[in-house]
């Protein structure tokens, strides 16, 4: 069984989680979000299976994939923690529009073998989990910027 982690469950993170739940209902989804209401909604609606009370939750170390869907400063902070706890083969990705600073941090941390930067070209004028939609990424470009050592089988 694949385990997917989300740090940030707003419009984009929530939309990706909803799509994963729809197309891969057997996957185990964990999430952290600043808004406890969003987590409660995601849990009660069956989108996620587990709530992480903090972004540095050790359960993220059990994930096969971790989506960083928070503001870039928080994503940068999470990278160092994830480096210490991630299991072999875990792929970490982000959904931010800024790539230079996050790839610089990935290189500094020696994580070029497990990081795939991502930028979904989708969104809405609305924000938050309540406005997320499993179809928001349909027919949208999703630009990937993998680290230099990521195996092609992960892309």
Region roles according to the model:
Residues 27, 49, 90, 113-114, ...:
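A structural micro-motif
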Residues 30-32, 52, 93, 116, ...:
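Hydrophobic/aromatic beta-strand patches that form the interior of the parallel beta-sheet core
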Residues 56-86, 90-91:
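Rossmann-like NAD(P)-binding element
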Residues 81-124, 130:
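Glycine/small-residue-rich loop that forms an oxyanion/phosphate-binding "nest" at active or ligand-binding sites
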Residues 109-155:
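Rossmann-fold dinucleotide-binding core
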Residues 1-54, 60, 65:
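NAD(P)+-binding Rossmann beta1-loop-alpha1 motif at the extreme N-terminus of oxidoreductases
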Residues 34-35, 70, 95:
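Short beta->alpha hinge that forms the Motif I/post-I loop of the SAM-binding pocket
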């Amino acid at each position: 069984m694949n385990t997917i982690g989300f740090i940030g469950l707003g419009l984009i993170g929530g939309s990706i989680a909803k799509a994963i739940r729809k197309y891969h209902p057997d996957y185990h989804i964990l999430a952290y979000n600043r808004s406890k209401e969003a987590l409660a909604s995601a849990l009660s609606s069956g989108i996620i299976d587990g709530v992480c009370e903090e972004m540095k939750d050790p359960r993220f170390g059990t994930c096969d994939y971790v989506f960083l869907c928070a503001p870039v400063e928080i994503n940068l902070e999470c990278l160092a923690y994830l480096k210490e706890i991630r299991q072999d083969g875990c792929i970490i990705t982000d959904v931010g529009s800024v790539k230079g600073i996050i790839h610089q941090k990935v290189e500094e941390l020696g994580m070029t073998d497990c990081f795939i930067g991502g930028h979904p070209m989708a969104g809405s004028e609305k924000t938050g989990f309540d406005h997320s939609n499993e179809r928001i990424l349909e027919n949208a470009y999703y630009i990937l910027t993998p680290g230099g050592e990521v195996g092609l089988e992960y892309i």
